A protein has these predicted regions:
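TPR/TPR-like (Sel1-like) alpha-helical repeat modules
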Residues: 144-171
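Conserved small/polar residues in nucleotide/adenosyl-binding loops
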Residues: 177-179
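Canonical positions in the second alpha-helix
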Residues: 43, 77, 114-115, 149, ...
């Protein structure tokens, strides 16, 4: 927003949709998440299929470490948006990864892969994917994802090191299968 918080509150002071949304965002930036959540829930009750309302409410819940609510509303955003972009899947992967549960990490990996299928040059999605793989114990895949990330940000030497490490780990795992 281009206005200070007090101006936003003064200008957008009714209960119409624009005012509720403006004050929800302004309060979110001010750290007044309770007011933001109240406004967003009112908007979602009026417009349950609006993906942008669901996305913002999910983001607010995530900022408050309420990962269950964050994923619920973000999933609603994904299901209601006309065309999902890579960032929606990346955010969902991030939300799921924070649960620190293997089944949620597996879901996170699926969402992050969807994100990377749309935009393989998103270095942060590769970073999140490496973290999710590590959380599930798939260290070779975590190292591969890290190599991709370093390649994208121009760290060729680190990229090569992680690619070699991933390759060696994959070879070791394959040799264990043949025993």
């Amino acid at each position: 927003f281009t206005h200070p918080h007090y101006e936003t509150e003064a200008v957008y002071n009714s209960t119409n949709d624009v005012d509720l949304y403006a004050t929800a965002v302004s309060n979110y930036f001010q750290g007044n998440h309770k007011k933001s959540i109240e406004n967003m829930k009112r908007l979602i009750n009026k417009h349950p299929s609006n993906p942008f309302y669901n996305e913002l409410l999910g983001e607010i819940y995530f900022a408050n470490n309420d990962y269950k609510s964050a994923t619920f509303y973000h999933e609603a955003a994904i299901n209601n948006i006309e065309k999902v972009n890579d960032l929606y899947y990346m955010m969902m992967g991030n939300y799921l990864w924070t649960f620190e549960e293997t089944n949620k990490s597996t879901e996170a990996i699926l969402n992050l892969k969807k994100s990377l299928l749309i935009n393989s040059e998103n270095a942060y999605a590769w970073y999140l994917l490496s973290r999710a793989y590590a959380q599930t114990g798939s260290i070779s895949l975590a190292n591969y994802a890290t190599a991709e990330r370093y390649f994208l940000i121009g760290e060729r030497e680190l990229s090569y090191e992680f690619a070699v490490k991933a390759s060696k780990q994959i070879e070791e795992n394959l040799s264990l299968i043949h025993i």
